[in-house]
Amino acid sequence: MEENFKRILREKVSELNLSLDPLQEEKFYLYYMALKEWNRKINLTSLEGEEEIILKHFVDSLSCIIPIRNENIERIIDIGTGAGFPGIPIKIYDEKYKLTLLESQKKKILFLEELIKILELSDVEIVWDRAENLGKDPRYREQFDLALARGVAKPNIVLEYALPFVKTGGIFLGQATPNNLSEWENAQKVVGILGGKTEEKIEINFDNITRIFLKIRKINNTPEKYPRRPGIPEKRPLLP
């Protein structure tokens, strides 16, 4: 089972023109086993098949590396990380990053804490809070080179969660599909309100999956009133 897992992982990762060393492959296998075990107790993922998890969680997360490879990135925040996607796969791939995982559900925090021990990852901070609260905290506000938020909310909502964390000159990496790209394009006014500018769109294809990344550069400080109080961005989204 383990060797089959690693073989599939290698094949799928190679479609991104990336490669993993044996230790990285082992860590992804341990991640997979922990995910399967904990998923019996709490709802971490609806995916069950080995290849499906490899492709739609691990490889999809690693695809985020492509748009940022030439950027000077040290600190990353993964907002609404859930079971650790995409932050932990990125950290496994390159341990130089200092990673903050933000999650509002306590049961998922417990999984992440256990997972970090299993994978023996350093420079990983796990924070139990909401983005609307943490984005006001001076220890986190505008402190990150890169913010990620995978499948958290619609673009005009997730932008309000994410951009306050990004330092001037840093990046929020929006993750779109052909089906929702228009929502990102319609949210460009919100990008500007929050201090960002969409620099480029990068399309990546692997295993019949298309991902479109929007590299949003932080060019101005986010106005102090954002993010608004918990729940408000979702109830009253900033209009495109």
UniProtKB/Swiss-Prot annotation:
Molecular function in Gene Ontology: rRNA (guanine-N7-)-methyltransferase activity
EC number: 2.1.1.-
GO cellular component: cytosol
Cellular location(s): Cytoplasm
Residues the entry annotates as binding S-adenosyl-L-methionine: G80, F85, A131, E132, R150
Keywords: Cytoplasm, Methyltransferase, rRNA processing, S-adenosyl-L-methionine, Transferase
Top-level EC class: transferase
HAMAP family the record matches: 16SrRNA_methyltr_G
Similarity comment: Belongs to the methyltransferase superfamily. RNA methyltransferase RsmG family.
Role this protein plays: Specifically methylates the N7 position of a guanine in 16S rRNA.
Official protein name in the record: Ribosomal RNA small subunit methyltransferase G
Organism: Dictyoglomus thermophilum (strain ATCC 35947 / DSM 3960 / H-6-12)
Organism placement in taxonomy: Bacteria, Pseudomonadati, Dictyoglomota, Dictyoglomia, Dictyoglomales
Gene: rsmG
